[in-house]
Structures are given as structure tokens and as C-alpha cells.
């Protein structure tokens, strides 16, 4: 179930303030955040936001196609090291 339209998208206040401050200064610094649940809004387009994945901050450059998605979608939390290699040939 998606969020109610009358509530609007969730964006952390501190993150929105940082983005608006950089927009007012026409500055493009990397914004560090732990708020993976924040929705990407059109104000963020063109900024690089470093999203925490539990271990480090992953830089995410926001484009217009990302609007409406969550920041956490672009910073994977699990490292995939590949499937187990079967040794069927070695057992013969």
C-alpha cells in the first residue's frame, strides 16, 4: 500500500533544508545522509547525495528519472559475492 496523497511524500527535514540551502547558494557539494526512507523530490535533481548503507556512504547522483523513489533504493545494503561454485566435475 502506498502513502496517502493528502500526506505528501516523506522527506527528512534536515535533508530538505540542506538541499534548499545549496540551491540558494548554487552550490553542488555532496550531502551526507542516513535517511534512506526519504523520497526523492524534484528539488534534489542535480545534487549528489551520499546515502548510508550500514557500513559506508554510497554517492548517488540524482536525476529526473529518480523522482518519486526512495534514496535507499540506490544504495544496496547487501554484498552479493556470487553463487556457490559446484565441484561436480572434480568429484568424478
UniProtKB/Swiss-Prot annotation:
PROSITE patterns on file: RIBOSOMAL_S19
Disulfide-bonded cysteines: none
Pfam families hit by this protein: Ribosomal_S19
Domain of life: Eukaryota
Keywords, alphabetical: Chloroplast, Plastid, Ribonucleoprotein, Ribosomal protein, RNA-binding, rRNA-binding
GO MF, any single term: structural constituent of ribosome
Cell location: Plastid, Chloroplast
Gene Ontology CC annotations of this record: chloroplast; mitochondrial small ribosomal subunit
HAMAP family, sorted: Ribosomal_uS19
Protein name according to UniProt: Small ribosomal subunit protein uS19c
Organism: Oltmannsiellopsis viridis
